[in-house]
């Protein structure tokens, strides 16, 4: 915190560096099972720095949003866990297909929004409260669905007696999704404050 008070540019530098390192570690952890223990741990370290700085900035702008985001994240994780454990939501092949189609559709939509942002006619699209809120809510819903997927994947890995590196991969997936949920809730909390 001392570093940020004396040098405000450190916020941006820290966000950029930790963001890049987070991205690299995430790619490694997802694509190379044997590297998932180290890459997943480093991902959590760098993502922790990234989210810490992001939360510090959000709290400086709007007091109280971080605790709201933390409590919201805990609530979502608890609800999803209870729904998964009790069998209210079953992760079947149909669920996987829906999740895949929904995720691909969301990514295509986000790419189209990005492309539209390059044209002056659509320049106000990303500043539109309704559009940003809708994107955040859909992203939060998608992250919640991925948490069901991650829990099922972890259960399958444990039950099948897969090697330890796959357990690390499942743990990485759960951590990644919970942090995704936190960022989306933080974003929504800032918007409504």
Task: Locate predicted features.
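A hydrophobic alpha-helical transmembrane-helix feature that marks the membrane cores
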Residues: 1-193
């Amino acid at each position: 915190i001392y570093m940020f008070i004396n040098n405000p540019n450190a916020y941006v530098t820290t966000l950029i560096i930790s963001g890049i390192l987070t991205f690299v570690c995430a790619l490694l952890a997802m694509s190379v099972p044997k590297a998932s223990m180290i890459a997943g741990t480093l991902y959590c370290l760098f993502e922790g720095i990234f989210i810490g700085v992001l939360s510090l900035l959000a709290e400086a702008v709007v007091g109280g949003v971080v605790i709201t985001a933390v409590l919201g994240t805990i609530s979502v994780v608890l609800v999803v866990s209870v729904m998964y454990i009790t069998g209210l939501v079953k992760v079947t092949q149909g669920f996987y297909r829906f999740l895949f189609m929904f995720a691909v559709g969301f990514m295509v939509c986000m790419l189209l929004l990005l492309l539209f942002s390059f044209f002056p006619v659509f320049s106000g699209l990303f500043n539109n409260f309704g559009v940003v809120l809708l994107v955040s809510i859909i992203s939060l819903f998608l992250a919640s669905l991925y948490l069901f997927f991650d829990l099922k994947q972890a259960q399958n890995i444990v039950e099948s007696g897969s090697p330890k590196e796959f357990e690390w991969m499942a743990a990485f997936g759960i951590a990644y999704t919970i942090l995704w949920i936190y960022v989306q809730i933080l974003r929504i909390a800032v918007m409504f404050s």
